[in-house]
Curated annotation (Swiss-Prot):
Coiled coil: none annotated. One of its GO terms (molecular function) is proton-transporting ATP synthase activity, rotational mechanism. This is ATP synthase peripheral stalk subunit b, mitochondrial. Residues 1-42 form a transit peptide. PANTHER family: ATP SYNTHASE F(0) COMPLEX SUBUNIT B1, MITOCHONDRIAL, MITOCHONDRIAL ATP SYNTHASE B CHAIN. The gene is Atp5pb. Disulfide bonds: none annotated. GO terms for cellular component: mitochondrial inner membrane; mitochondrion; myelin sheath; proton-transporting ATP synthase complex. The keyword Phosphoprotein does not apply. It is found in: Mitochondrion; Mitochondrion inner membrane. Keywords: Acetylation, CF(0), Hydrogen ion transport, Ion transport, Membrane, Mitochondrion, Mitochondrion inner membrane, Transit peptide, Transport.
Length: 256
């Protein structure tokens, strides 16, 4: 069985090793795709997880299938028995005490395999499953880290692709700052002009008021100067008469 496994593995790996003769192992590892595509058969070929069927614990099933068309169903057994008797009769193989020791040891090995082989195989499979689980956990952790790195790289690339928006925002901020400065200076100029206009208006109003007061004083002085003593006496007498007349009218009216 072991020889058949070795031969099948060698036959499987022969084309890959033939093509990889001119390359080093590092190059072969570098050319292998990471988690994508079909796995390469170099530098190590895949080994079968379970062996083929055997009879008598040693003879491959393919040997019997090869002899069945030529010798029939009992042909392999007859051939094996005949060869054994031929080797014994011709003394090609001589039975010695070591032969019985070998038979005893082989029988003991077969008994141990039949008795404890299943439980031992389950124990080995359990250890293998634990190792596979650990390796799978490491693999998933590595894949997660790589995926996180890929997502971060994509996010960074997206930010790089949108960097022109940042320039537009900065350009708009500068334009807004210039507009605010322009508006502030315009408002300041408006206030300065308004204050100056208010000052000129106040000056004009004050000058007009002073001119009016001066005109009134001037007219009053000249009017008073133009009134003679006789006119003043006549005016006073006229006022007294008017007051007396008003007093009589007030006395003549009945009290309500």
């Amino acid at each position: 069985m072991l020889s058949r496994v070795v031969l099948s593995a060698a036959a499987t790996a022969a084309p890959c090793l033939k093509n990889a003769a001119a390359l080093g192992p590092g190059v072969l590892q570098a050319t292998r795709a990471f988690h994508t595509g079909q796995p390469r058969l170099a530098p190590l070929p895949p080994l079968p997880e379970y062996g083929g069927k055997v009879r008598l614990g040693l003879i491959p099933e393919e040997f019997f299938q090869f002899l069945y068309p030529k010798t029939g169903v009992t042909g392999p057994y007859v051939l094996g028995t005949g060869l054994s008797l031929y080797f014994l009769s011709k003394e090609i193989y001589v039975i010695t005490p070591e032969t019985f020791s070998t038979i005893s040891v082989v029988g003991l090995i077969v008994y141990v395999i039949k008795k404890y082989g299943a439980s031992f195989g389950e124990f080995i499979d359990k250890l293998n499953e634990e190792k596979i689980a650990q390796l799978e956990e490491v693999k998933q952790s590595s894949m997660k880290q790589i995926q996180d790195a890929i997502d971060m790289e994509k996010a960074q690339q997206a930010l790089v692709q949108k960097r022109h928006y940042l320039f537009d925002v900065q350009r708009n901020n500068i334009a807004l700052a210039l507009e605010v400065t322009y508006r502030e200076r315009l408002h300041k100029a408006y206030k300065e002009v308004k204050n100056r206009l208010d000052y000129h208006i106040s000056v004009q109003n004050m000058m007009r008021r002073k001119e009016e007061e001066h005109m009134i004083d001037w007219v009053e002085k000249h009017v008073v100067k133009s009134i003679s003593v006789q006119q003043e006496k006549e005016t006073i007498a006229k006022c007294i008469e008017d007051l007396k007349l008003l007093a009589k009218k007030a006395q003549a009216q009945p009290i309500m």
